[in-house]
Amino acid sequence: MSKIAKTAIISPKAEVGKGVEIGEFCVIGDGIKLDDGVKLHNNVTLQGHTFIGKNTEIFPFVVLGTQPQDLKYKGEYSELIVGEDNLIREFCMINPGTEGGIKKTIIGDKNLLMAYVHVAHDCVIGNHCILANGVTLAGHVEVGDYVNIGGLTAIHQFVRIAKGSMIAGKSALGKDVPPYCLAEGNRAFIKGLNRHRMRQLLESKDIDFIHALYKRLFRPVLSLRESAKLELEEHANNPIVEEICSFILASSRGVAYKSSEYSSEEKQED
């Protein structure tokens, strides 16, 4: 049975699932769909064409689905899709997509968005990610599964952050970060590998292989793209090489790599 506070304002066109809790002074617009078990604390605002997945919990003063902060937006239909089992903490803002992007913003499952996180239009966030307090994603950013982004970090539009990577706090990232890398700074560059996350997700032999692969990719005698192409040729049908090297070759903004910044030493790995 759903629990809805008397002071909540809910459009008759909104769809509310079973066991939903809606706290005091929430405002729920016409195009909202709340799946079973969603919990809204007090003073949450949901607008636009927004879907919230099962058992997601949204804390006070969160604003989801309001008009994108993009001057090119002219009121076209767009969506915000939030998956299951997410925690969205106080004062977060997530905007829907635009005509200039994929027309939707997507948040996957089991993510933690800490207080004051901003996710702009057309962003895609995977599963099991943690965005710490004050993280800002500009438009069209892509974040893979199991990514951690430290507090007060800003991500430039169209940047991609691949699976298992970590961006240190107070960073400003303007280029792509491949799988399992650790980046830091303003501007942020890859400092090493996120071996802590690798140990959680991978077998030891795969960790060692990835470590050796990045040492070869970052060799000084070839460009990063040349190294990636060479690795794909020499390790055809290897899924790890395919994942990492294809990501590098698909980069439009370039990879956040500088030889003077990267270290393969163990002290960088945790």
UniProtKB/Swiss-Prot annotation:
**This protein's superkingdom?**
Bacteria
Q: What does this protein do?
A: Involved in the biosynthesis of lipid A, a phosphorylated glycolipid that anchors the lipopolysaccharide to the outer membrane of the cell.
- Specify the species: Helicobacter acinonychis (strain Sheeba)
Q: In which family does this protein belong, per the annotation?
A: Belongs to the transferase hexapeptide repeat family. LpxA subfamily.
State the reactions this protein catalyses.
a (3R)-hydroxyacyl-[ACP] + UDP-N-acetyl-alpha-D-glucosamine = a UDP-3-O-[(3R)-3-hydroxyacyl]-N-acetyl-alpha-D-glucosamine + holo-[ACP]
What EC number is given for this enzyme? 2.3.1.129
Q: Which gene encodes it?
A: lpxA
Q: Which GO terms describe its molecular function?
A: acyl-[acyl-carrier-protein]-UDP-N-acetylglucosamine O-acyltransferase activity
What is this protein's record name?
Acyl-[acyl-carrier-protein]--UDP-N-acetylglucosamine O-acyltransferase
